[in-house]
Amino acid sequence: MASGFKKPSAASTGQKRKVAPKPELTEDQKQEVREAFDLFDVDGSGTIDAKELKVAMRALGFEPRKEEMKKMISEVDREGTGKISFNDFLAVMTQKMSEKDTKEEILKAFRLFDDDETGKISFKNLKRVANELGENLTDEELQEMIDEADRDGDGEVNEEEFLRIMKKTSLY
C-alpha cells in the first residue's frame, strides 16, 4: 500500500551529491559515429546486431574486451533482441569517447610531472611541480602522496598507477 510519505531527496536534506557532467560529442564526432553505424546497418533497418557492435566500435578506434562487450550489450539490449538502435549505439560511443578523452587528459598531466621522461613520477618530480604551483607541502606530505599511489613499491608512480589514483580521487 502506498503512503503519502516521501523519502527526502539529497537536495532537501542539505547533502550535496556530485553530479558528473553528461558527456557530449561534437557534431563531427556524432557524424563519425553515424557513419560507422550506417556502414553496418546494411539492411537499413535502423539497428545493428550485437556482433556488429564490436566491429563498428573497432572502426571508431576502440578495442573492447569480451567482458566489456557483454556488459555494454546487456545495458543497451534490455529486451534481449540482439538488436541495437542508433541512439543506443550513440550512447555507448559517447561514453567510450569521453572516457578516452579523460584518459588522454590524465596522461597529459602525467607527462607534465615526468619532466625527465623516465616514465615515472619521482619524489623530485612531485616536489618540483608542488613548488611551481606554489603548494606549501612538506617532504613528508609529498612522500605520502607517492606512497598512496605507488602500487608496485618501487618508490615512484608509473602511468598505470597515476591513472588509477586520478580516477579513484574523481579528479577526472
Swiss-Prot record:
The keyword Glycosyltransferase does not apply. Keywords: Calcium, Cell cycle, Cell division, Cell projection, Cytoplasm, Cytoskeleton, Metal-binding, Mitosis, Repeat. Ca(2+) 1 binds at residues 41, 43, 45, 47, 52. Pfam families: EF-hand_7. One of its GO terms (biological process) is microtubule cytoskeleton organization. Ca(2+) 2 binds at residues 150, 152, 154, 156, 161. Its main location: cytoplasm. GO terms for molecular function: calcium ion binding; G-protein beta/gamma-subunit complex binding; heterotrimeric G-protein binding; microtubule binding. It is found in: Cytoplasm, Cytoskeleton, Microtubule organizing center, Centrosome; Cell projection, Cilium. The keyword Cell inner membrane does not apply. SUPFAM superfamilies: EF-hand (SSF47473). Residues 1-31 are annotated as: Disordered. Belongs to the centrin family. Monomer. Interacts with CIMAP3. Interacts with USP49. Plays a fundamental role in microtubule-organizing center structure and function. Plays a role in sperm cilia formation. This is Centrin-1.
